[in-house]
Amino acid sequence: MNYIQAIILAIIEGITEFLPVSSTGHMIIASSFFGIAHEDFTKLFTIVIQLGAILSVVVLYFKRFFQTLDFYFKLLVAFIPAVVLGLLFSKKIDALLESPVTVAVSLLVGGIILLKVDDWFNNSSETEITYLKAFKIGLFQCIAMIPGVSRSGASIVGGMSQKLARTSAAEFSFFLAVPTMLGATLKKCYDYYKDGFILTHDQINILIIGNIVAFLVALLAIKTFIGFLSKNGFKVFGYYRIVAGIVLLLIHFFIHPLTLI
């Protein structure tokens, strides 16, 4: 991976991390299109640059992160399912990351679900998140272990299924991203070093640049998304996912197979 490729992936991460379109899925597809080698460092990079994106949440919602202990306990309750299932199925998840077709199908199916959810829970207005709601949202988030599903999309749908207002569901999804992505990054780094890999000077620089770019882009993306969501809902994202999924499948089966090198 070179610096230009790293910046491209970081921009994609910053834009898509908090949108219900799957950042991991988009980075897998981008890697296939741009011929980015799907080596161990690339896998590490796509996880670690999420730190830059989640830092934007801490900056934008700084005061919200220093409220009551109740806030942290609810995040912990929502985070537990991801910890348990992530440890149990991490190897199978890594295998799915090798398949752009999995991403395409997930985009398509997820888009249909997003359209339905936006219709079903269009008038939801609750803002209070109980411990039970937090746990259920955490369960929904685990569905996003399948590439292309979207972590933010799954957790937002989980929130709306609990009658939360769109913006409340989206903001809790942002907050939940912090422990989830931090945990995923720490585990990925541990596995990387456990397997005997050592970062080179260039790789460290690439990670730093990637995180900075992802942070700056995510700042703008979150502000834009919340404003758009409160007025327009999820339909545009649902249609985008459906179109993207169909186009990718057509390309794969009729033009050129989408593969990771």
Curated annotation (Swiss-Prot):
Annotated GO CC locations:
plasma membrane
Q: What is its main location?
A: membrane
- Membrane topology field: Multi-pass membrane protein
Instruction: Write down the EC number.
Output: 3.6.1.27
Subcellular localization, as worded in the UniProt entry: Cell inner membrane
Positions of transmembrane segments: 1-21, 41-61, 69-89, 95-115, 129-149, 169-186, 206-226, 241-261
Which positions make up the signal peptide? none
**What molecular function does GO assign, one term?**
undecaprenyl-diphosphatase activity
Keywords noted in UniProt: Antibiotic resistance, Cell inner membrane, Cell membrane, Cell shape, Cell wall biogenesis/degradation, Hydrolase, Membrane, Peptidoglycan synthesis, Transmembrane, Transmembrane helix
Superkingdom of origin: Bacteria
Q: Which reaction does it catalyse?
A: di-trans,octa-cis-undecaprenyl diphosphate + H2O = di-trans,octa-cis-undecaprenyl phosphate + phosphate + H(+)
Q: One of this protein's GO BP terms?
A: peptidoglycan biosynthetic process
PANTHER family recorded for this chain? Answer: UNDECAPRENYL-DIPHOSPHATASE
Q: Tell me more from the record.
A: Bacitracin is thought to be involved in the inhibition of peptidoglycan synthesis by sequestering undecaprenyl diphosphate, thereby reducing the pool of lipid carrier available.
Task: Give the record's family classification.
Answer: Belongs to the UppP family.
Q: What does this protein do?
A: Catalyzes the dephosphorylation of undecaprenyl diphosphate (UPP). Confers resistance to bacitracin.
Which protein is depicted?
Undecaprenyl-diphosphatase
| Gene (UniProt) | uppP
